[in-house]
Amino acid sequence: MNNFIYETPTKVYFGKDEELKVGKIIAEFHPKKVLVHFGGNSARKSGLLDKVENCLREENISFVELGGVVANPELPLVREGIELGKKEGVDFVLAVGGGSVLDSSKAIANGLANPEVDVWDFHCGKAVPQKTLPKGAILTLAAAGSEMSSSCVISNPETGEKRGCNGLFNRMNFAIEDPVLTYTVSPYQTACGAVDIAMHTIERYFCPGEDTYLTDSIAEAVIKSVRKAAGDCLKNPEDYTARANMMWASSLAHNGLTQCGREFQLVVHQLEHEVSGMYPEVAHGAGLAALWCSWARYVYKANINRWLQYASNVWGLDIDFEHPEKTIETAINMQEQYYASIGMPIGLKELGVKKDDLAKLALDCSRNKTRSLIGYKPLAYEDILVIYQMAYERG
């Protein structure tokens, strides 16, 4: 087991009607003005936004709104939020929505706290936020795990880039998680969320590291729990137990718990970011589903034992010790069949990705052949291109 630091400063309020506490929670920060950040009209139509704002009024907390966040949150709205925050004197950001809203809120908080730096520089590796504004979240979608993660991913529509910014400064001060708020999530978005949650854990599971059987057991439990919960949610969208398990899994999958003692790099996420950066209409979870099995088939021989453990402990397969690769291939096929069964794509062609764009995707992912994606099997430009080609042919 490698040395590690585990820190989760986010305070979680979990359960029915916990969002009604938001006014009192934010009042503890003594803000001058709150930016209430959200997505489309659903937050308003559902009555959630009105509830939240009434809670703020009850505590005499001033606020200003900014809606319009889209899936794969975009830089122009982040810049708009920063300018609005400067004008209004915002010193607290409240995200009401899913991972895209939360990431956009994190970027705005970073930009407001560091006005001398262009916020996109934080996502290009040119600068690191030295401070940030306090922020909180009311979660309405179990998927990205942004409510407890140190990650923030923003898309730049001008360049087609989708880039992450990572650090403790991105942690929410609090997260309110009421599973009831996810009852109206569509089957497709529920499935996308299930993939994203599982993938945050599966990717960590396949990062280099040894003798992490406790971390492994936690990860395996998260993966299997999400699979069960997603199936139950798709059968009955108002199954509170299933929605609750999905929501809590979302948080645990991306707060660092399932990587303790192992190295960390989300390789398939890096592959997918280029896809949804170039094709912003692609849902992140769908992109991950379309890529993961091809990546798995390309890299598994670099660590046969690890993949056998996954096949046995996650999919319940008996290991064929004479032909171990058959066991692994069966597990990957089962994962692929599972994606298809919940309406997820198993290849890039299903997402509308053009074959002529594969080389550009590989160039962008490898930063014009200047970086490799590190894991059990390092992936240079040529490897990345092969994986994109394999994923294209699967669809």
Please place each PLM-identified region on the residue numbering:
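Active-site segments that bind and position negatively charged phosphate/pyrophosphate groups
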Residues: 204, 208-334
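A glycine/threonine-rich phosphate-anchoring loop and its flanking beta-alpha core
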Residues: 114-214, 309
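Short Gly/Thr/Asp-enriched flexible loops that form oxyanion-binding sites at enzyme active sites
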Residues: 51-52, 82, 101-115, 148-149
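ATP/NTP phosphate-donor binding region
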Residues: 1-92, 348
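C-terminal charged capping/lid subdomain of soluble metabolic enzymes
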Residues: 314, 318-395
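Fold-independent oxyanion-binding glycine-rich loops
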Residues: 16-17, 38-40, 69, 96-98, ...
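Glycine/serine-rich anion-binding loops at beta->alpha junctions
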Residues: 90-106, 140-146, 281
